[in-house]
Each structure stands twice: as C-alpha cells, then as structure tokens.
A protein has these predicted regions:
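A short helix->loop->beta-strand "cap" motif at the edges of active sites that frequently abuts
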Residues: 121-127
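Conserved SGNH/GDSL esterase-like catalytic core that processes O-acyl groups on lipids
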Residues: 17-26, 31-112
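Bacterial N-terminal signal peptides
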Residues: 1-6
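Alpha-helical scaffolding segments of alpha/beta enzyme cores, especially the outer helices
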Residues: 106-109, 113-120, 171-178
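Residue-level recognition of beta-strand->loop/alpha-helix junctions
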Residues: 54-56, 131, 189-192
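Catalytic His-Asp segment of secreted/periplasmic serine-dependent ester chemistry enzymes
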Residues: 135-231
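Boundary at the C-terminal end of the N-terminal hydrophobic targeting segment
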Residues: 11-15
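Alpha/beta-hydrolase-fold catalytic nucleophile elbow
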Residues: 92, 130-131
Length: 231
C-alpha cells in the first residue's frame, strides 16, 4: 500500500532513521532546483547528515512534451550514466505537465517509466515521491480577456494554458498518488499536507505566484525531512 505522510508520523530522532547518512538524488522541475530550493535540501542534509545531489531542471515534467533535454526520464538517465549510486531517489513532481496539458494517462505512464529506470539501474535504492505543490493564486485565477489582450502575442497562449489547465492540478496529484500506490512508492502529498492555501500563498510564493520563495521552502522543509526520515 502507498505510504502517505501523516503529521507526527516521525516521532523518533533523525539519527535513528535508517535513512540517516545516505546519499540522495533529486529529480524534478524548478520546484526542485531553483536557488531558494537549496533551503529545504540543506535542511534534509543537516537533519539526516545526507548528501543531496540535484538533477532537476527548470521546466521539466514527466512528459517529453516538457522538453527532451529536461524531462525526468532524461534526468534519471544522466544520473545513472555517471555510475554514482545513490541510496534514495526522490521524484519531485512539478506543474509543467499540467500547464502543458499533458494527458493524465501520459503522466502516469511516464512516472512508471521513471520508476522502472531507477529500479533497473539502482535496484537496492529507495524511491520516494513528492507530489506537485499547490499554487492557489493561479489555481483560483480567472482568465481576464483584457489582461490577455494587453500581453505580447507570443506570451498569450502559454498564459491562457497556464490559467485554464492549472485548475486541473488536483487531478494530476490524485493520479500521481494512484501510480505510487500501484508501484508501492512512498508518496508525500504536498498538495494537501503543505498547509499552503489561498490565504497564506502571498507569503510563500514569489511574484510569479508559481514558485516558492525562501519563506515557502522554509515552510515545507521539515515536512519533507520527516517524510524522508520515516521512509
């Protein structure tokens, strides 16, 4: 059965975790690799005495539509090609598949491809999954024709897709959870457990309302560290 974070699940000290002192590889989009994300990864490293290596690339998703030079299967291939073995492989879902309108079934299929690549290339390793984060301001935004018209034409389609498709984000997260349950992968539902909502989102997001700021990463870092420790 899929392992899902429950608050308070990790009551022991970090030193007692079987994941203490391990090597962790992280794959994903900009959530996993922008400068501010170093806050949460440094926290994992501190609490778990872990060495954390980021393979994530901005704009990446599970589907090749997000870019063959960026997508997660390619990140995993590059990681495995280094010959370095990691103890824990974290798949951190972005919102790029959502905004690009990737079919849910395609997201599911490519998550399974990522899992299979890791299981084949590093059979002794653990795989953990972090869901996409909520982006409440964009999820609740209404498409404004006047705002759209005021934009340079080259930006309009992406903007329209972002606003329309982002309302489907909960469906993508539900499918991420379903796949992890099927594959017996521990799943951290950041969408529901991060505590980020439409009221506090301005405190936790940068000006684009899509990427967390330093306060946002400070807000989720302990939830993530406890999840890693417990699984």
């Amino acid at each position: 059965m899929c392992a899902i974070l429950t608050l308070g699940v990790w009551a022991q000290s970090y030193e007692q975790s079987e994941n203490y002192g391990k090597k962790i590889a992280v794959f994903g989009g900009s959530f996993s690799e922008i400068i501010a994300s170093n806050i949460t990864k440094a926290y994992w490293a501190e609490k778990l005495r872990a060495r954390v290596t980021t393979f994530g690339i901005g704009g990446a998703g599970f589907s090749v539509i997000t870019g063959e030079d960026r997508w997660l299967p390619g990140q995993i291939d590059r990681c495995l090609a280094t010959g370095e073995k990691f103890d824990i492989y974290i798949l951190w879902a972005s919102t790029n598949d959502v905004t690009r309108g990737v079919e849910l079934e395609e997201q599911d299929r490519m998550i399974k491809v990522c899992i299979e690549k890791i299981r084949k290339g590093a059979p002794e390793a653990k795989i953990l999954f972090f869901s996409s984060l909520p982006v409440p301001i964009l999820e609740n935004k209404v498409l404004d024709p006047a705002e759209l018209e005021s934009m340079p034409e080259r930006f309009r389609e992406n903007y329209r897709n972002q606003i329309v498709n982002m309302k489907k984000l909960p469906e993508y997260v539900a499918h991420q959870e379903k796949v992890c349950a099927e594959e017996n992968i521990p799943f951290l539902n950041l969408y529901t457990t991060s505590g980020i909502n439409q009221y506090n989102a301005p405190d936790f997001f940068s000006s684009d309302n899509l990427h967390l700021n330093t306060a946002g990463y400070n807000h989720i870092k302990e939830t993530q560290a406890r999840f890693i420790a417990a699984h």
